Amino acid sequence: MATKLRLESTSPFQGLPELVARDEGLFAAEGLDVEFVKRGADAPTKVDRSITDPDMVSAFASHGSAEQVGGAAMFNACEWGNYRRVEDSQTGSQQVGRRAIIAFGALMVAPDSDIYTPQQMANKVVGVPYHAGTHYLALLMLEGFIPRDSIKTCLAPNGSRNRLDALLNGEIDATTLTEPYITIAERKGCRMIVAAPYHGTEVASEEMDAPTYAAFNRAVREAVKRINADKRKYLQYFIDAHKSDPDVAALTVGDLNPSRLQVVDPAPIPAEELQRTYDWMHGWGMLKTIAVTDLVDDQRQLAGQQA
């Protein structure tokens, strides 16, 4: 009898290997009956320039919202946001390892913007989805060019389509996007100011035991192998996931940049990287009291990598 595993819903830019593992029977081959459950009913849907501090909104508005009420055993999201979610968790959930996909995010401006370089971003309002990956990515990318006190952000909606619309409508000076909306934005004449790849992690409740996590990772590793063998085939997922959007439906795989799709085997979070990320988040005041040793369930992390 298959083991039932409920995961929070995901998108290709952050969870392509899991989607491939589901669609190609890789989870089933490991004895897992995987169900993706909805999340994010309370996620922001519009820009709010009066909200300029991530502490003003919940870290669980989208990612983790189902897990926190017992609806899912595990979810993946950006590594930084998951540090904060572990600190804020009411269920004792912890990180159990890094996810397979390396997400790609870009900070972009509208075609008529007078901003051409990161240095020109000082005191410009960047709309970001607080506690999601490109929120933190924007800070990391910009602080290499301008002082921290010159980086200005406000709350922007979840979903790159919503943020792109806000950018084109002039509601914000810049925003962050993921694929396929980086490509859509470029086709509309928007400019990429700075971009980078970034890691994510898996956060699990106590419901997720080590053998189940190991089986999950075995399926994901096979999906990684298949994606890396034929990226163009799997880039179609980025179109299909958003095909209700006419702009995306008009794309072909040839329009997407395969270098922005990177997947690796899921793995433990290296201790030195864990510490650096922890220190960086403390430096921004985005972690409060949690100890670095409480961020990860080391036992499940190691056991979950068993072949």
Indicate where each model-derived feature is located.
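Pocket-lining segment of extracytoplasmic ligand-binding domains
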Residues: 154-242
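Short, low-complexity disordered leader/linker segments with a strong preference
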Residues: 1-2, 307
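Conserved C-terminal helix/tail region of periplasmic/extracytoplasmic solute-binding proteins
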Residues: 279-307
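Short secondary-structure capping/turn micro-motifs that flank functional sites
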Residues: 37-38, 43-44, 73-76, 183-184, ...
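Secondary-structure end/capping motifs
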Residues: 210-288
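Short, glycine-/small- and polar/acidic-enriched structural segments
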Residues: 2-153, 173-176, 194-195
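Ligand-binding pocket scaffold of soluble enzyme catalytic domains
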Residues: 36-38, 158-164, 251, 255
